[in-house]
């Protein structure tokens, strides 16, 4: 569970640079916060508990990389990560979600991560057992007298032949009938009631623990059956109590909670009436879990003292100082993310590992179509994105998705008929596709 000591703050920023353009201050802040976790683990136990994480408040318009920075950071260190929106929560007693469900969901994520890792450790053993079970369905072992099974070394040549065929994938499409565990569902009438997700998961847990698990027969291909049996066997081989313990520890020490739209629950100005009272109620409910408390979960009690909280908001109408003082004090690190410029858009289109241009080229290549964006086309797209963001709502890099979809719409639709062809997107074509939309203010507002 220890954080990799090789990841220095500089290396963390370099890793984030592969996916996110600019925003150096924000990257630096999260890199230091992450490194401090590793430093804390090296301290003597009595001092370790005293060192609490420095939570971060990110301030900046939508689409500039706030969420992406936090998500990539969590992936980097295999930390449990959850993103929640502050507006989805209401103060206790009103319709809405209970803030403690944030921690319950975080531990769920942690549990799934640890379980997947442990199952991977026993994957080879589970695969061997699954293969034997599939062979039992295909070529049942011959019973000896008095019903005892023949020894392994005496198994029939047919079974040995089938084993080879199974390993080589020659039986993948053959259909077999197998017994599988029946999953219990506790959904009532398909109705989702806000705030009752936790009760539903607890009901599922309760029903699944009542008596032996039911099994039902299913007809599947050998490939599908192998996967299902392999997962069932892997679950039997791992110690679920150990998984739960590790999941709680990982959530407590490595968990990252990203609270988006925190500005929407800030009271605006000096007024404290109407909706502002409810907003303050949400902040006061968030305060205990950010300060450090113990939350009961189905995996056991979870201490929130060392969970890293990253809050974010555009703060167009409210200011960070409009948050209640106690909550402000729990987010000592403030970073402002800059609005994106034309140069940033050019980099976003081309530089990251998952750059949008690379994505479109890869998607079209699946249809046998070669796609190329010229340098002047990329400059033109970036220029248009900047202009539209200035004239209408500033939605940051998300504007590029809208513009590129508009440009690629016809090509994507006709791609199966364009196999073997090369499409070159230049600035002239970009202007043709977007010309009328850009010049007409009303169309821009609705289409881009």
UniProtKB/Swiss-Prot annotation:
Entry-linked Gene3D superfamilies: 1.10.8.60, DNA helicase RuvA subunit, C-terminal domain, P-loop containing nucleotide triphosphate hydrolases
Keyword ATP-binding found: yes
Any Gene Ontology biological process: proteolysis involved in protein catabolic process
One Pfam family from the record: AAA_2
Annotated localization: Cytoplasm
Cited CDD domains: RecA-like_HslU
Keywords: ATP-binding, Chaperone, Cytoplasm, Nucleotide-binding, Stress response
Keyword match Cytoplasm: yes
Family according to the record: Belongs to the ClpX chaperone family. HslU subfamily.
The protein's role, per its UniProt record: ATPase subunit of a proteasome-like degradation complex; this subunit has chaperone activity. The binding of ATP and its subsequent hydrolysis by HslU are essential for unfolding of protein substrates subsequently hydrolyzed by HslV. HslU recognizes the N-terminal part of its protein substrates and unfolds these before they are guided to HslV for hydrolysis.
Oligomer and partners: A double ring-shaped homohexamer of HslV is capped on each side by a ring-shaped HslU homohexamer. The assembly of the HslU/HslV complex is dependent on binding of ATP.
Protein name: ATP-dependent protease ATPase subunit HslU
């Amino acid at each position: 569970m220890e954080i990799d000591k090789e990841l220095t703050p500089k290396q963390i920023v370099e890793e984030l640079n592969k996916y996110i353009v600019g925003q150096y201050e924000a990257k630096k802040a999260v890199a230091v916060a992450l490194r401090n976790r590793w430093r804390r683990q090296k301290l003597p136990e009595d001092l370790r508990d005293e060192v609490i994480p420095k939570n971060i408040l990110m301030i900046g318009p939508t689409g500039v990389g706030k969420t992406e920075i936090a998500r990539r950071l969590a992936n980097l260190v295999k930390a449990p990560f959850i993103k929640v929106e502050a507006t989805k929560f209401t103060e206790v007693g009103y319709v809405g979600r209970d803030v403690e469900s944030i921690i319950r969901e975080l531990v769920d994520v942690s549990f799934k991560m640890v379980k997947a890792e442990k199952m991977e450790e026993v994957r080879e053993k589970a695969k061997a057992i699954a293969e034997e079970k599939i062979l039992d369905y295909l070529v049942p072992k011959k019973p000896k007298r008095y019903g005892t099974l023949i020894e392994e070394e005496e198994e029939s040549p047919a079974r040995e032949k089938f084993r080879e065929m199974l390993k080589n994938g020659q039986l993948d499409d053959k259909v077999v009938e197998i017994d599988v565990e029946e999953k219990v569902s506790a959904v009532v009438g398909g109705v989702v009631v806000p705030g009752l997700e936790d009760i539903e998961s607890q009901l599922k847990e309760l029903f699944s623990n009542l008596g032996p698990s039911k099994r039902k027969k299913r007809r599947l291909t050998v490939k599908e059956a192998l996967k299902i049996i392999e997962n069932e066997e892997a679950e039997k081989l791992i110690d679920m109590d150990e998984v739960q313990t590790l999941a709680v520890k990982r959530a407590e020490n490595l968990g990252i909670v990203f609270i988006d739209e925190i500005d929407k629950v800030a009271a605006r100005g000096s007024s404290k009436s109407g909706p502002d009272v409810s907003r303050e109620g949400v902040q006061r409910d968030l305060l205990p879990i950010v300060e450090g408390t113990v939350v009961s979960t189905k995996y056991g009690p979870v201490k929130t003292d060392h969970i890293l909280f990253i809050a974010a908001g555009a703060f167009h109408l409210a200011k960070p100082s409009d948050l209640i003082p106690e909550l402000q004090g729990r987010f000592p690190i403030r970073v402002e993310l800059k609005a994106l410029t034309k140069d940033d858009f050019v980099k976003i289109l081309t530089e990251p590992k998952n750059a949008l241009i690379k994505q479109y080229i890869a998607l079209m290549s699946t249809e046998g179509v070669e796609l190329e964006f010229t340098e002047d086309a990329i400059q033109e797209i970036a220029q248009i994105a900047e202009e539209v963001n200035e004239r209408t709502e500033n939605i940051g890099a998300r504007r590029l998705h809208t513009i590129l979809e508009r440009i690629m719409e016809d090509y994507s639709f006709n791609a199966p008929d364009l196999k073997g062809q090369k499409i070159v997107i230049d600035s002239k074509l970009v202007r043709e596709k977007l010309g009328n939309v850009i010049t007409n203010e009303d169309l821009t507002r609705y289409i881009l």
